């Protein structure tokens, strides 16, 4: 089967590699370097499984800048373009999704278009009306950055939103779900073909629950530090309850990354006509955590604050909406000199702060080293290290 994918970020590229094991897949992107990288079998993003599969697997995969070449004759066109949160509109910016749909329809008037980008509730119906087509369905992704292909190979569930009253479209939705399952290694995978709105909002609720869990354990940590208690002991006791579990429970400077901040804000906006307290509290409490972390650092009265890594996860190369950036902004408001150690940054400054290339120099000039996640590189400076990482994992 011929499949097109718009976007080569962690969603689009992981799907491309997954499906190219058994199908002819063409990826379109507007960035020439990414296209060349994929065609040279080098991953433009950090993902160990993607890097391995590009080198070791026989993939029927091609990347291109040419939409006519990509969309012609395909049966499915997957839209995996970014939908950042627009604070002025108070919702996702879906312009890239609509641009991709428009381009696809110019070159192919028969394929089924699958939106993989995260979107607001009601958007699929809205965009079907806007483009006067019944060929668009929605399939939420449940992927982790830097582990996107792994999560496609071992999916927790496959969800497709469709018009359940349209038997042909529902058939196409099931077929798309089977395409994803066919590329997976995991054999027993729940498949749920549901209404558009249910699929859309389930994605937002899933990520907001994860954000809530992050905030819960961060509040245990804040309480413990203020009261002089051992947060690890308390978290261990809490998590021995199998209903809670010892996972996703490591304190941090707050939730961040590409998905959780924007998805929680979108869900909060979706609740505008629905009574709620929790969703608003989750969004607000993440700001409170950053305020607290910044205050704890300022209390140590450092002249030079060293920020060790901007990335949210130790195996990631992305620091969009990183929690530590929020802490930096708060410290900057108090006039603190801030230096950064971040090997993924090639320039000498970032956000107006000096980037130190030498780890030894960084340690020497910093009065305090702030690390969202612990690393063995920092074991020799425990006396000036500030981290809330208790377990040495995500």
Curated annotation (Swiss-Prot):
Keywords: Capsule biogenesis/degradation, NAD, Oxidoreductase. NAD(+) binds at residues 2-19, 29, 34, 83, 118, 145, 258, 262, 320. Its EC number is 1.1.1.22. Pfam families: UDPG_MGDP_dh, UDPG_MGDP_dh_C, UDPG_MGDP_dh_N. The keyword Oxidoreductase applies. GO terms for molecular function: NAD binding; UDP-glucose 6-dehydrogenase activity. Coiled coil: none annotated. Substrate binds at residues 141-145, 203, 207, 248-252, 256, 313. The active site is at 259 (nucleophile). GO terms for biological process: polysaccharide biosynthetic process; UDP-glucuronate biosynthetic process. Pathway: Nucleotide-sugar biosynthesis; UDP-alpha-D-glucuronate biosynthesis; UDP-alpha-D-glucuronate from UDP-alpha-D-glucose: step 1/1. The keyword Glycosyltransferase does not apply. It catalyses: UDP-alpha-D-glucose + 2 NAD(+) + H2O = UDP-alpha-D-glucuronate + 2 NADH + 3 H(+). It is an enzyme of class 1 (oxidoreductase). Belongs to the UDP-glucose/GDP-mannose dehydrogenase family. Catalyzes the formation of UDP-glucuronic acid which is required for capsular hyaluronic acid synthesis. Directly responsible for the transformation of some unencapsulated serotype-3 SP mutants to the encapsulated phenotype. This is UDP-glucose 6-dehydrogenase. The lineage of its organism: Bacteria, Bacillati, Bacillota, Bacilli, Lactobacillales.
């Amino acid at each position: 089967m011929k499949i097109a994918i718009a976007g080569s970020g962690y969603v689009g590229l992981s799907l491309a590699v997954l499906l190219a094991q058994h199908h002819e897949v063409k990826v379109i992107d507007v960035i020439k370097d990414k296209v060349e990288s994929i065609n040279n079998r080098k991953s433009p993003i950090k993902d160990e499984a993607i890097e391995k599969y590009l080198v070791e697997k026989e993939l029927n995969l091609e990347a291109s800048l040419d939409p006519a070449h990509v969309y012609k004759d395909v049966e499915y066109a997957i839209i995996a373009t970014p939908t950042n949160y627009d604070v002025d509109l108070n919702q996702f910016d879906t312009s890239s999704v609509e641009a991709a749909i428009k381009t696809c329809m110019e070159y192919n008037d028969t394929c089924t278009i699958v939106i993989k980008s995260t979107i607001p509730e009601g958007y699929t119906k809205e965009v079907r009306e806007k483009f006067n087509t019944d060929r668009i369905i929605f399939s939420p992704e449940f992927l982790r950055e830097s582990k996107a292909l792994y999560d496609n190979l071992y999916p927790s569930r496959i969800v497709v939103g469709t018009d359940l009253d349209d038997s042909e479209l529902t058939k196409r939705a099931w077929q798309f779900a089977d395409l994803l399952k066919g590329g997976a290694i995991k054999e027993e995978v729940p498949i749920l073909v549901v209404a558009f709105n249910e699929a859309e909002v389930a994605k937002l609720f899933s990520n907001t629950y994860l954000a809530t869990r992050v905030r819960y354990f961060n509040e245990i940590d804040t309480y413990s530090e203020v009261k002089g208690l051992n947060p690890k002991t308390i978290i261990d006791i809490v998590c021995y309850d199998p209903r809670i579990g010892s996972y996703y429970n490591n304190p941090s400077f707050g939730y961040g990354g590409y998905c959780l901040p924007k998805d929680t804000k979108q869900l909060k906006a979706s609740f505008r006509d629905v009574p709620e307290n929790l969703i608003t509290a989750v969004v607000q409490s993440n700001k409170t955590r950053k305020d607290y972390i910044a205050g704890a650092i300022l209390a140590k009265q450092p002249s030079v604050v060293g920020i060790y890594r901007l990335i949210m996860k130790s195996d990631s190369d992305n620091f969009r909406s990183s929690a530590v950036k929020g802490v930096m902004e708060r410290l900057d408001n108090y006039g603190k000199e801030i230096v950064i150690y971040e090997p993924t940054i090639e320039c000498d400054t970032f956000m107006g702060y000096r980037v130190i290339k030498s780890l030894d120099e960084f340690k020497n000039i910093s009065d305090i080293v702030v690390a969202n996640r612990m690393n063995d590189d920092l074991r020799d400076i425990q006396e000036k290290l500030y981290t809330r990482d208790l377990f040495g994992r995500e």
